[in-house]
Amino acid sequence: LSPIPGPQARGAVEGIVPPAMLAGTSVPFPLRIRNLGSAPWPSAVPPGAPSAQTVCLLAAWWAPGVRHERALAAMSADLSILRDLSPGESYEQTVWVPVAETPGIYDFEIVVEQVDGARFDQPGNQPLRARVTVVSP
C-alpha cells in the first residue's frame, strides 16, 4: 500500500445527522461512502494486519469556532470502511459513532482519511457535517 496523491484523494460521505444526541453513547449512522477520486481505496484488511495507508472514516466533535484539526477535537474516532472502493464506486454501510462525553453544542463531522497518507481535504471532497446538540442522558 502507498499514500494516495492529494489530487486523487477525493471522497464523499452522505447521511442524515440527528440534531440532538445523548452524551457518552454510541449512535448508528447509515452512510453512503463514495470514491470521487481516480485512485482505488484500500480499506479492508485482515484482522491483526497493519492499517497503514488504508482508507477509513474519521468522526470528530469540535466546540463551535474551533479549527477543525484532529488534535483540537473534543473527541474523535476512526471508523473502518468494510471493503475496498474503486474510483467512482459507492458503498452503503452503517457505522457506530461515539458521541461526545460532555453535553453542549458541537460541530460534528465524518470525513474520509488515509492512515499515514492522504488527508482528503482538497476541493471536491464532501464530508458529512452538522451542528449537533449533545444532551445529558
Annotated model-derived regions:
Residues 96-104:
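Short, surface-exposed loop/turn segments at beta-strand-coil junctions that are enriched for proline
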Residues 33-37:
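Asparagine-centered strand-capping/turn motif at beta-strand->loop junctions
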Residues 80-91:
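Short proline/glycine- and polar residue-rich coil/turn motifs
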Residues 39-58, 107:
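Short, hydrophobic/aromatic beta-strand segments
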Residues 42-43, 116-127:
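Beta-sandwich strand segments
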